[in-house]
């Protein structure tokens, strides 16, 4: 609830590091925001929600004439992919679309995302907990590490993506 996102400690490491200083060493000591107002913004982070995925293989392959050379094929695929992605989000500026090739370029899927850019650090354990065991224990089970960090997604008053603003509110899933 309230827009919380849990991820691995190493995935949040750069954000934790960017907020750290000699005075406030959040990597060494950890971080906890005891109120919404103390959560730390992260301008380089965003969270993407997958809205839908669609198989567009037929539309992509129909645009490629039989016998097309590989270099020309790549240009056609790139061009039609751009067009399909633009069509998919033409009526909604809050969405982003991309075409991904699968199986060596024999299948193509359109994915539509909604990106939230106001993401704030809520909690991070000290690195001694979040990275306990280091690479030695990374692929060994059972693991005994607190490998997590917590962020919160914020949205505008209509629960839509927005740039950082103190007026934004925690995101609530539909």
Describe each model-derived feature in a short phrase.
Residues 1-174:
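Terminal presequence/propeptide segments associated with secretion/organelle targeting
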């Amino acid at each position: 609830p309230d827009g919380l996102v849990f991820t691995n400690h190493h995935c949040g490491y750069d954000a934790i590091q960017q907020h750290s200083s000699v005075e406030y060493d959040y990597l060494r000591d950890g971080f906890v925001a005891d109120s919404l107002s103390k959560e730390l913004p992260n301008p380089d982070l965003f969270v993407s929600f997958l809205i839908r995925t669609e198989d567009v293989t037929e539309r992509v392959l129909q645009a490629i004439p039989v016998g097309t050379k590989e270099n020309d094929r790549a240009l056609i695929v790139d061009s039609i992919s751009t067009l399909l992605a633009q069509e998919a989000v033409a009526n909604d500026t809050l969405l982003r679309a991309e075409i991904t090739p699968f199986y060596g370029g024999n299948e193509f899927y359109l994915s539509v995302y909604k990106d939230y850019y106001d993401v704030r650090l809520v909690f991070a354990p000290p690195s001694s907990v979040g990275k306990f065991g280091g690479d030695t224990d990374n692929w060994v089970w059972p693991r005994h590490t607190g490998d997590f960090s917590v962020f919160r997604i914020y949205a505008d008053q209509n629960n839509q993506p927005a740039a950082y603003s103190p007026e934004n509110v925690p995101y609530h899933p539909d």
